[in-house]
């Protein structure tokens, strides 16, 4: 009854107007699953590889080759398999690809099928996706990390850090957390506008004002939190995504916007000072992806009082995460399904983190779609934290809206993670 009888891949557009892969999976009993694959702007060197067409069509970014793989090689390999055998299906696709980075079939082709299979199996079982994947204990609604000021690769401004985020740690529900975020977002918009700044939004729905440095961005956010009637650090904490790999050159961190250069120790001390001066509770990619010594120094410096999240460092890869755990580097992993390229490997990364006492943060990409799968996965894994952009653009709000629905469905079983999500608070 849950055998796979049809798989259809197609080329659609993501939130940046670039092509991406969407996959439909149909089971013998008529159950159906659909998944669309996200794509990043600042990508780690160790990520699984997307299959793109090259050439002039869509300026080389077309995904017709990946769609052809879905409709051909992948369908031939898993047609007739039981959709409830997720691990076996994912392993079959990994083996079929045969490379270390999914570069043959393409992580975008494999992931689209992997997620669509899970959705079809969930429908066949009569369960919502979060319950099908997570079981009866899936009940924790994550604290959102809301990216309300953009810089770096996500914006055309002098700010070197990529994201400035607010975390409604003092809210009592996801519904209330979204309200907190929305009120601060709109207050910030007015304050930026009054100060003469542009209030257009970037890839992830945050503002991209022409500010001189990180402190200026943090000051605007702090003022907006207070103006909206909240207490910084108590109701709403702050977070950074430095995306430091993007400005790591020849062993140093080159801040072109500030016209400053910091060596790894100076970079770590700078982040420590920011975390001391502001209620910053989480810093993502504070050091570059291959600057393991810098990461170790930063972790030893502030890892006991600040969540240090590895994104480009770990790329949702359990093997790299285990290296980090062994070396005592970072204390959290960012989880992006397309970095590793299958649902099973994504879940394995979260489990590996939790077993080692590391936290895990479910995350979107800057190129998103209306697909809200990561909202379900955040609840399924009880990871307690999610990054899915600002409070604007429907590709971002789709995930918040899905979390609100899940909370409503769970009713009294639902628990908003709040401060407990960040073990150091």
Curated annotation (Swiss-Prot):
UniProt xrefs under HAMAP family: Enolase
GO cellular component: cell surface; extracellular region; phosphopyruvate hydratase complex
Superkingdom in the source lineage: Bacteria
Keywords, in A-Z order: Cytoplasm, Glycolysis, Lyase, Magnesium, Metal-binding, Secreted
Catalysis performed (reactions): (2R)-2-phosphoglycerate = phosphoenolpyruvate + H2O
Cofactor(s) listed: Mg(2+)
Family in the record: Belongs to the enolase family.
Subcellular location, record wording: Cytoplasm; Secreted; Cell surface
Protein name listed in UniProt: Enolase
Catalytic residues of the enzyme: 204, 336
Record-listed Mg(2+) binding positions: 241, 284, 311
Pathway: Carbohydrate degradation; glycolysis; pyruvate from D-glyceraldehyde 3-phosphate: step 4/5
GO biological process: glycolytic process
Chain positions recorded as (2R)-2-phosphoglycerate binding sites: 162, 336, 365-366, 387
CDD domains the record matches: enolase
Task performed by this protein: Catalyzes the reversible conversion of 2-phosphoglycerate (2-PG) into phosphoenolpyruvate (PEP). It is essential for the degradation of carbohydrates via glycolysis.
Protein's organism: Brucella melitensis biotype 2 (strain ATCC 23457)
Gene Ontology MF: a single term: magnesium ion binding
Cofactor note: Binds a second Mg(2+) ion via substrate during catalysis.
Gene of this entry: eno
NCBIfam families documented for this protein: eno
Disulphide connectivity of cysteines: none
EC code(s) of this entry: 4.2.1.11
